[in-house]
Amino acid sequence: CSFICTDPKGSLICETGKMLQQNGYRIKVLNTINFKKSMRYNPFSYIHSVKDILKLVTCLMQNTRGDGKGGDPFWEKAEQLLYTALIGYIWLEAPEEERNFNTLVEMINSMEVREDDENFENSVDLIFKDLRAKNPNHFAVRQYAKFKLSAGKTAKSILVSCGARLAVFDIPELREVTAYDELELDTLGDKKTALFLIMSDTDDSFNFLISMCYTQLFNLLCEKADDVYGGRLPVHVRCLIDEYANIGQIPKLEKLVATIRSREISACLILQAQSQLKALYKDNADTIIGNMDSWLFLGGSEPTTLKELSAALGKETIDIANSSENRGKEVSHGLSYQKLGKDLASVDELAVLDGGKCILQLRGVR
């Protein structure tokens, strides 16, 4: 099978890379700690339809930060409209070598707004004006027209938020890494491949790239399984997602985990505590956990995790013998037996689990 491994600190590839290569595996690396040691990853290379544009924008919004407008959803929705319009134009109209985040950032940087002149047209306005003249129903034109409903001061605030969200792309190394693609994510189900996603466990500045990679990976492989291979990939793809809470949010994961297994894709989410998953996915966390066939507990002290695991393990029946002795004029003795239910592993017992032991819970097995 193929492996996709989250590799905090980059130690896994050093320990296993050579062995995998000797056993016929292709090795792919996305290194967000040291971009000079990374292969190129261009999310735009995996856009095949308008739906993919919307998925990419959703992932970008959920895993990056704007300028923090107090939680007002208006600003995020306005940003989303602009990203959708610009990415739609880049994908549908720009030359192949310009289909990347670098072009997106340059277009936003060139969008000058003048508050005192509502009729001023910047270079991007002129691009969309020409495109509208050729094709009024163009997807990108329709999205851009909605963005242009905002007034000058509002538009400037939206652009500032966009600039803050995409500020990381001003780093030359990141611009180079995302300029074109070498990962070939859509081929991981075709032949044995090991993809190592190296990320920092102390700095999450570039973790949105890892989340974006997983999001596109799941969608690409599911589509390829259905469209090319009749529902099942020829090579099983196993995702070992360590430090899952630090990666960010994969949109619609609660639906993906319920459907990927039938397409020869499996996912192993590794967390420090169950509460981390709930912080990311809120009510959908229970759905994600419910779709997992196995649960491996290596120890921990987080109360919610311990309580839910204790309840999931259930109870065992124990026999209790009670003896009594009464001393009066005459001495009498009594002995009674009863059966009681006891937690198979109490919260206290789980909290002090031996470091050399673990608890594995399998679906359908007690």
Which positions does each model-derived feature cover?
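Conserved ATP-driven motor cores of ASCE-family P-loop NTPases powering translocation/secretion/packaging/pilus
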Residues: 257-362
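P-loop NTPase motor domains
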Residues: 1-265, 280, 339-340, 348-366
